[in-house]
Amino acid sequence: MVELYNDYKLMDEIKDNQGNAGALWKDLAECIKWQQEQADVLPDAHWVGGNPWDGKKANVDGWAAWNGKKSVLTLRNPSASAQTFTTTLREALDIPAYVRGKITLTHAFNQAELDGMPINKAIDIDTPLVLNLPGSSVFIYNGR
C-alpha cells in the first residue's frame, strides 16, 4: 500500500510557465507515470553519494537502481552552492565487478543539462564521471 498526502490548495495554486494554475497536478501525474514505467528496476534502489548533511556540509546524494536491462539514477545537491561529484556508473548503480558494458542515459524529465553527464551517448560503466551540480539541484536519468 502507498499513501500520498497532498496540500490541495498548494497543488491548485502553483502556475505553469503559461500562467495556468494547477501545474503541480500535472507534475504529480508525470511522476506517477514514470514510477509505473520503472517498476521493474526500482526494487533495486539504493543510496548514492554522501550523507545529505554530515553536521558540517550538505553533500551530493541520491539513489540509483540497476537490473541488468535498465537503470535509474537520481543525484541531488542540497547545498545552495555548486558541488562536484565524481563517480562511475558501476559505482553509482552498484553493478557487479564481473559485468562489462555501456549504458546510455536519457533525461527522465524535462530538466537542465548536468555539466559532465553525457546524454544519449553510450558510457562505459567504468569511465569516471566528474559532475558539476549547481546549488539546490536534482537530476534524474533513465538508463539502458
Model-identified regions with their sequence ranges:
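Short beta-strand and strand-turn-strand segments in soluble, beta-rich domains
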Residues: E113-I125
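Active-site-proximal substrate-binding groove within the catalytic cores of carbohydrate-active enzymes
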Residues: M1-A112, P128-G135, G143
